[in-house]
Amino acid sequence: MLDMGDRKEVKMLPKSSFSINNLVPEAVQSDNHSGHSHHNSHHPHHHHHHHHHHPPPPQQPQRAAAAEEEDEEKAPLLLPPPAAGALEAAKAEALAGKGEAGAAAAELEEKEKAAEEKKGAAEGGKDGESGKEGEKKNGKYEKPPFSYNALIMMAIRQSPEKRLTLNGIYEFIMKNFPYYRENKQGWQNSIRHNLSLNKCFVKVPRHYDDPGKGNYWMLDPSSDDVFIGGTTDKLRRRSTTSRAKLAFKRGARLTSTGLTFMDRAGSLYWPMSPFLSLHHPRASSTLSYNGTASAYPSHPMPYSSVLTQNSLGNNHSFSTSNGLSVDRLVNGEIPYATHHLTAAALAASVPCGLSVPCSGTYSLNPCSVNLLAGQTSYFSPTSLTPQ
């Protein structure tokens, strides 16, 4: 009987152990283990035989651990994300793998991009500035092709009163030519030198009633035939034929308008405008020059007394408001200084070709006054020629 029981026990135990280890969880295995131990306690002989043919119970946890390892192997592998430091290290390794040539190429690409950005910004700035000035290139303004004399003449001719102070000339040039806003010291000195040396520019003293400082600069009337050359942009003088036509037109204009003296009481200097019509309100007749030369002074004409024309008789006698007359002038009753002033004023108010009899022995020829170039020359004793 014992042999049969042993054989049956041997046949059954491997099946139970195999099914428990592979199909049942650990908790069920522990329960089964407790039940199996209880069964072995009832059959000590069988327990002895089981202990002889099967491994001890402590081997079961090892089998459970092996099963857990198998489950872990079957599960998908989940790797943690790489750290930032690892990424940088990988990039550095990649660059190192490229070698020095790769690094140099990358630097060149960066430089080209930066240069293109700068160029685009510069072009945008230039477009904005070109709409305003249109002369700026490479960050600097182009120098205008005009000479300093031409710039001065443009400034004076475009002024309303045909005269400007030195500062007024500077302001005109800087306003119309942005190139001269820089390096003021150099070109301003050149402007002063050209004003002093060129005979086309005449200095006019400022009237004492005129506030401000600095003298005025005007164009000499003889410079009317001066123009700015189109090729050299320098001052040029018209040909003789052109000057004759200009003088003829000027003489016709003066004849039609008429020139006489105007009262300006209390004035010591009289800056005359070239196109100012001089007419005395109390003159009984209008006297004008019949010549074709310039009949107006560009310099201020000093005089100490105001001349008024009371009447023009058949004997062509002129008198002044303060009692000055040609007779007194010739007879020496007037001081020498007043003699020059009065003679010049009287001669300027008499048309050319008209002789003024003086005490029956002398005649006054007004054409001896040199007004052709705008220079006022006064009478000397040689201006009085005996008849």
UniProtKB/Swiss-Prot annotation:
InterPro entries: Fork_head_dom, FOXG1, TF_fork_head_CS_1, TF_fork_head_CS_2, WH-like_DNA-bd_sf, WH_DNA-bd_sf
Key words of the record: DNA-binding, Host nucleus, Oncogene
GO cellular component: host cell nucleus
Record-linked CDD domains: FH_FOXG
One of the protein's GO biological processes: regulation of transcription by RNA polymerase II
Ranges annotated as biased composition (Basic residues): 35-55
Annotated localization: Host nucleus
Transmembrane region(s): none
Region Disordered, annotated ranges: 28-80, 101-143
Biased composition (Basic and acidic residues): 108-143
SUPFAM superfamilies on file: Winged helix' DNA-binding domain
Keyword DNA-binding: yes
Organism: Avian sarcoma virus (strain 31)
Record protein name field: Transforming protein Qin
Location, primary (coarse class): host cell
Note: This protein is synthesized as a Gag-Qin polyprotein.
Gene Ontology molecular function: any one: sequence-specific double-stranded DNA binding
Residues annotated to bind DNA: 142-233
